[in-house]
Amino acid sequence: MLLLNTSPKELGLELVRVLFVGVVIGILGGLAANLFVLGVGAIDGLIREQMVGQSALSAGLIRWAALIAGAFGIYGLKQAFKMDRWHGPADAILGAHRPDAPFPAREGFISTTAALVSASAGASVGQYGPVLHFGASVGAQVRALFPTRLTPDIYVACGVAAAISAGFGAPIAAVVLVSEAILRHFAVRAVAPITVSAIVATAVTPLFFDRVSPYSVTASPTDWGLLPVVLGLGACAAILAIVFMRSLLRTAAWAKSLNNELAMLLLAATLMALIGMLVPEAVGLGTQSVNDLLAGEKLFGEAALMLVAKLGATVVCIGLGLVGGVFSPALFLGASLGYLAGYVAVGLGFDSSAVVILTVVGMAAVAGSVIGAPIGVVLIVFEFTRSYEFAVAAILAVSMSSFISTRLFCYSFFDRQLVARGFDLRQGREFLSLKDISVADLDVEAVESVTESMACLLYTSPSPRDRTRSRMPSSA
């Protein structure tokens, strides 16, 4: 870290380091994130092409075959690389808080590949969690190749920021979200390289890829009379987020207790195919379904069915082992809940534009509680809607949702996963560092023992000060 009396030469070298790390990780992280997203879309598109013109049963069987193939692929990856478990955003957070521990980049790349297989096959999982962890692994790998005076957590944070920025096209939100959810601080030393990575990743996307923001919405003026409805939606979003997260953890614990991973994967694939035959919107990432909600193209009953189906499908897929993220499903659930709230608001006499506003607000409220980044999610809303009014409504609902979910569940889904593994980030980084140190490592064997005679001498021999006092005349 530079001091106030830093020489111009040292300052120049530090700036070069910051720019180098930020640009390299921004380019690599942006490329990796875009390739992942486009890869999922390309493979899923090939599967959907085979389903065109088929009967509902035939199309369902094609999707089931793809999911079964994905289940075998995931199981094969885990066995081939001897993975004890899949890694995800929780490991990226833990890696940033344990800079002295080696970051498991290899496991990160393998886990991202498994998530690619799962999402491409049509499992109800998210893509941004794997992309986030992929970015963190890229950052850690860059540090292994090009170490500098920057700390390891900054490399990880740069990779995450690049991935988020490329995925959403929201560099400001990426910087804040990383500082809020990954680093858990806003230190100046970290902001510069993270910002460079986020902006470079955003710039890389249009240069090399034909991609736009995954969600599209037309902002409209906000009726501030909706604020009580927004507060109520925030409370409902917290309850939905808690149900979602608890269901995921309990299903995963149940599946693990059975100790038959392949059977659980095949069961997840079969159940997902059945749900998809009944509610096609629940299949895969659900990006188009969310855009349909944002456009107001669903009926009340359809949105309610989509919410229930997506909740069940995601719990089945992730809980039973089809690896993937939780952010996209959280956005889907929040959009469905907000859409329902919008219909209620219209019934209470508000303008039809309330449906769009509350759909966006619901997305932010549920996602903010699940990933533990309320301000970052609000900024994502602001950047993809370009609406100050939408952002204000979102921050009100997100604050209410996060307030409730933090007290009734945990700071985020990832924090709860870490607590289950014995890592409580609320205790601080010092606590995590002490967990890595064994008391036995501090034991000193070369101790000189004190005999009984030496102890008597030490106890009975007067100190020089006592002898001096004994020679002093009494004042009496």
Q: Which residues does each PLM region occupy?
A:
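Hydrophobic alpha-helical segments, chiefly the membrane-spanning helices
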Residues: 472-476
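Alpha-helical transmembrane segments and immediately membrane-proximal extracytoplasmic
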Residues: 1-461, 467-469
